[in-house]
Amino acid sequence: MFKYTDRSVRQYIERQQRSAMLEQEQAEKDKKERRKAGLLFFGTIVVLVAVVAVYIVPQSLDAMWHENYEKPAQEAARN
């Protein structure tokens, strides 16, 4: 049978502790990366909504205004 020594047991425990610490550090890094990716995704959505609200909506409203009110008024003024 294999005889365990205090040194081999101590080395085994140290290796287990080191690997547990490395796994915990990796889990924390992964959590931070997921949070960062989530914030980036949320920020992208916010920017897209802002572009629609600031640029596209006013232009479409202006086009509708021109089509529904200005154009008929100009045609009526010509006639």
UniProtKB/Swiss-Prot annotation:
Any single Gene Ontology cellular-component annotation: membrane
Location (main, coarse): host cell
Gene disruption phenotype: Disrupts inhibition of host cell division. Has no effect on host DNA synthesis, burst size or latent period during infection.
Native species: Bacillus phage SP01 (Bacteriophage SP01)
Protein's recorded name: Inhibitor of host cell division protein
The keyword Mitochondrion is annotated on this UniProt entry: no
UniProt membrane topology term: Single-pass membrane protein
tRNA processing recorded as keyword: no
